[in-house]
From Swiss-Prot:
It is found in: Cytoplasm. GO terms for molecular function: DNA binding; excinuclease ABC activity. Belongs to the UvrC family. It holds the Pfam family HHH_2. This is UvrABC system protein C. Residues 197-232 form the UVR domain. Residues 15-92 form the GIY-YIG domain. Interacts with UvrB in an incision complex. GO terms for biological process: nucleotide-excision repair; SOS response.
Length: 603
């Protein structure tokens, strides 16, 4: 659609609440929003300046629709449903549910007490969430001892162990009145809603009576139940003392991002929290409302008895989303402090996010920029690094890794089997791989690097530059990475003539070069080992006097693997059925081969 088309539609927007749907060139809905005044909100996207994320959204908008509603509350409810239906990519996307465990009383003729992570609309009674399965199991264990509900998923034809333990009424054999189940369910509900203190007091009275009647075994059982209640139900620090289930919301905003923290308070205890961070495009309080609406659409987020909100939120709109929950905007006291605590945690989480982003920027993009400055070249956003690997001239390979803005781009990694070089000639190997790589770059019009890094010194650098300039006509900066006697990145060589680029050893740009050199070395060695594992046995035994195809097969059959042959003594090799002089030659050859391999891998 043309900008004229959008301007014409903007002129027709009403001064009423409603929802708007932004569309891209394919007609896909990419963003859904709500507004108290549609005209003001939608026009704001196409006028004035915006931050980068909002600008990205606006750049993709080629058309929009709107739906007028009778109130802001109705707009919120409609927005939630539209987001659920269309899943626009620029809207808040709540992370996948963290499925908390719940205790459930099943809706069956003979109900069971189970632990589940799935909350369904099946008329069962759900209690929770609990912070983990262990906590839920602890509570269920107490309930199983106190209330003998059915344990088996299907009724057997005879009583089981639970009946003999007093933890099941055995409905498989005996008739159990529905009123008995209702009584137990009511007591379980009361227990989980803070009434366990009443249960504990009743048990203490029963324990005293049993002790007075000399029924010490029964008194001991009551004592164990009391101890279980004390250790399980009373070990957490109380947040509130009225045992009401609550969700406490707080949010913070910074640099176009919002963090929402939700504290789950169950039975007076703060048991868990949910943290969500996302960019927002609307007014902060409006997007926060949308978040709450989406939050309680998740199956495992059961609205509690009460919800605490910050004082800048439209509580009437939230009430429409969760009509059976009491919405409270605390003004003072402990309740207000809980909301402040949720806000404080949200602010800390956002600060940490941006600090981590800054640190990551410092060690990647920032390091690349400073590396370019130190070398006197434009910022090398794309760096391609090369390393060769061979052992005694066998299976020579080369590898290339690519870093984009200081980060590995593994889709752009390449590995090469060397085709034209005989023996361990590092310079010729470098010439071949540079020729193959950049001939293809030219042919297929692939992205050119801003810098080529060679794992080596003057000889390797000159070989690479000669191919680039004199054969391919390319002028790409080439630098070399030298190592010290401990095989660690030591110097960056660059220029004509070559000079050491002065870099602080503890600088991020030096660390970046280390990561590049280590990564290309790892990639080359891994590729070389893969080839050696396929051809190693054959190639190591090639050229040994007295070892032809028949004896190679005999050695392989006897030892089973190259690893075992490498570890074998002369006598053990002789036991494979070869003469002593041949066994000595094989052992000598393998020992020499292993020493050279070790030295090459340390390169």
């Amino acid at each position: 659609m043309s900008s004229e088309h959008i301007q014409n539609k903007l002129a027709l927007l009403p001064d009423q609440p409603g929802c708007y749907l932004m569309k891209d060139r394919q007609g896909t809905i990419i963003y859904v929003g709500k507004a108290k005044v549609l005209k003001n909100r939608v026009r704001s996207y196409f006028s004035g300046t915006h931050d980068s994320k909002t600008q990205r959204l606006v750049q993709e908008i080629v058309d929009f629709e709107y739906i007028v509603t009778s109130s802001n509350v109705e707009a919120l409810l409609l927005e939630i449903n539209l987001i659920k239906k269309h899943d626009p990519r620029f809207n808040i996307r709540l992370k996948d549910d963290k499925t908390y465990p719940f205790i459930k009383i099943t809706n069956e003729r003979h109900p069971r007490l189970i632990i589940t992570r799935q909350v369904k609309k099946d008329k069962g009674k759900y209690f929770g969430p609990y912070p983990n399965v262990y906590a839920a199991n602890e509570v269920k264990r107490i309930l199983d001892r106190l209330y003998p509900l059915r344990k088996c998923s299907t009724l057997p034809n005879k009583v089981c162990l639970y009946y003999h333990l007093g933890q099941c009424l055995a409905p498989c054999v005996f008739d159990v009145e529905a009123s008995k189940y209702k009584e137990m369910q009511d007591e379980i509900v009361a227990f989980l809603n803070g009434g366990y203190k009443t249960v504990k007091n009743d048990l203490m009275k029963k324990m005293q009576v049993a002790a007075e009647n000399m029924e010490f075994e029964k008194a001991g059982e009551f004592r164990d139940q009391i101890n279980a209640i004390e250790t399980t139900m009373e070990k957490q620090k109380m947040t509130m003392n009225d045992f009401v289930d609550r969700d406490v919301f707080g949010y913070a905003i910074d640099k176009g991002w919002m963090c929402v923290q939700v504290f789950f308070i169950r039975q007076g205890k703060l048991i868990e929290r949910d943290v969500s961070q996302f960019p927002f495009y609307n007014d902060a309080d409006e997007d926060f409302l949308t978040f709450i609406g989406q939050f309680y659409q998740k199956a495992n987020h059961i609205p509690p008895k009460e919800i605490y909100l910050p004082d800048d939120v439209d509580s009437e709109a939230v009430q429409a989303v969760v009509p059976d929950t009491k919405i409270i905007v605390p003004q003072r006291g402990n309740k207000k402090e809980l909301v402040k605590l949720a806000y404080k945690n949200a602010k800390i989480a956002l600060n940490e996010k941006f600090m981590l982003l800054e640190r990551n920027e410092e060690r990647t993009v920032g390091a690349v920029e400073r590396l370019g400055e130190a070398m006197g070249i434009p910022t090398p956003s794309r760096v391609e690094a090369f390393d060769n690997s061979n052992i005694h001239g066998t299976d020579p390979v080369s590898a290339m890794v690519t870093f984009l803005d200081g980060k590995p781009s593994k889709n752009d990694y390449r590995k090469y089997k060397i085709k034209t070089v005989e023996g361990p000639d590092d310079y010729a190997t470098m010439r071949e791989v540079i020729r193959r790589r950049y001939w293809r770059v030219l042919k297929e019009r692939l992205p050119m690097p801003d810098l080529i890094l060679i794992d080596g010194g003057k000889g390797q650098i000159d070989s690479a530059k000669d191919v680039l300039i004199n054969e391919l006509g390319l002028d790409i900066p080439v630098a070399g990475l030298a190592k010290d006697d401990k095989h660690r990145t030591s110097q960056l060589l660059f220029g004509d003539p070559l000079e050491i680029v002065p870099l602080e050893r503890n600088s991020q740009e030096f660390y970046l070069l280390q990561r590049m050199q280590d990564e290309v070395h790892r990639f080359a060695i891994t590729f070389h080992r893969q080839l050696r594992s396929k051809t190693g046995f054959q190639s190591i035994l090639d050229g040994i006097p007295g070892v032809g195809p028949g004896r190679k097969k005999k050695l392989l059959k006897h030892f089973g693997s190259m690893k075992k042959l490498k570890e074998a003594s002369v006598e053990e090799i002789k036991e494979a059925g070869v003469p002593m002089n041949v066994a000595e030659e094989v052992h000598k050859h393998i020992t020499t081969f292993n020493e050279k391999a070790k030295n090459t891998e340390q390169k």
